[in-house]
């Protein structure tokens, strides 16, 4: 099987995380841009898994590499698990995360800590050159903070607070974030699935 993986993202932060976690597979890992693939896939699934599979399949049909795609988002329990699969599109795709984060803080104004529970969810799909599809999921539980904290991370990280660590995910070191994060968990699970699939 091919020694090449294409990850369906243009996000530099994600690529850094992915390369760190999948390094010991001993495969070359490319972003879509690096692989010269420019497909826009409409993410119209109703679950994170459906969206990841849609992306992996659409891009997998254009290359003989293994294609990994993820869909991830934030579920806030008090807001009926919003923004969920619409996390990237919440308040519009071009809206800055500073505005998105402030909106969620405002919507939880006056809500006590025990009702501010939330989780990051990440589903990853792998489309193999022989047409097989693998999926994994990872989650991390936390609460929505009262303000943005930390300069690391991206997206909703500054308002996602981990009580047991006393900080937001934007305040974690890259190593700790990879260990704890939803994407880190889903990627490590996918790494094991890929090892099994490549041996088969």
Language-model features: where?
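Anionic-ligand binding patches
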Residues: 2-6, 12-200
């Amino acid at each position: 099987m091919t020694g090449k993986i294409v990850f369906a993202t243009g996000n530099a932060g994600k690529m850094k995380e992915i390369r760190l976690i999948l390094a010991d597979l001993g495969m070359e890992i490319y972003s879509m841009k690096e692989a010269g693939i420019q497909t826009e896939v409409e993410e119209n699934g109703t679950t994170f898994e459906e969206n990841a599979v849609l992306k992996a399949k659409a891009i997998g049909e254009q290359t003989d590499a293994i294609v990994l795609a993820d869909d991830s988002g934030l579920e806030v329990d008090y807001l009926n698990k919003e923004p969920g699969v619409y996390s990237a599109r919440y308040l519009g795709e071009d809206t800055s995360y500073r505005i998105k984060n402030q909106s969620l803080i405002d919507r939880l104004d006056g809500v006590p800590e025990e009702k501010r529970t939330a989780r990051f969810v990440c589903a990853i799909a792998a489309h193999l050159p022989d047409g097989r599809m693998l999926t994994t999921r990872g989650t991390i539980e936390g609460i929505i903070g009262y303000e943005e904290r930390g300069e690391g991370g991206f997206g909703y990280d500054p308002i996602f607070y981990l009580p047991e660590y006393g900080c937001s995910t934007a305040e974690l070191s890259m190593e700790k974030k990879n260990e704890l994060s939803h994407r880190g968990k889903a990627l490590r699970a996918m790494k094991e699935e890929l090892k099994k699939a490549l041996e088969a």
